């Protein structure tokens, strides 16, 4: 099932599945999931480097958290190529 986030009537809320808190993930991975969900809920885009800039964790820490989410099935990563031939990753949050 693909992830769908819906906002309540107040746009300052992000809704995440309660299962994320019971999935046995690290606090880092859960926090990353919530940060990504917040950006996606308002229609934004985000990268690992932007997540690292937003938080005290470095890029290596962010990437390890993303790998943890991916391994647990909460995140799907696919590679894309832009019109200049550069590769980039696209992340999709999942509901488990």
How would you describe each model-predicted region?
Residues 1-10:
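N-terminal leader segment of winged-helix/HTH proteins
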Residues 1-2, 32, 95:
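Intrinsic-disorder/low-complexity regions
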Residues 9-23:
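Short, Lys/Arg-enriched N-terminal segment that forms or immediately precedes the first helix
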Residues 11-12, 29, 33-35:
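Hydrophobic, proline/glycine-rich low-complexity stretches
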């Amino acid at each position: 099932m693909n992830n769908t986030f819906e906002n309540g009537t107040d746009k300052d809320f992000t809704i995440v599945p309660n299962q994320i808190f019971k999935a046995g993930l690290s606090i880092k991975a859960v926090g990353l999931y919530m940060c990504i969900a917040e950006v996606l809920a308002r229609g934004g885009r985000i990268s690992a480097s932007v997540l690292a800039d937003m938080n005290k964790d470095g890029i290596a820490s962010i990437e390890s958290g993303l790998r943890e989410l991916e391994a647990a099935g909460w995140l799907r990563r696919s590679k894309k190529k832009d019109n200049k031939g550069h590769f980039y990753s696209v992340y999709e949050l999942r509901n488990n």
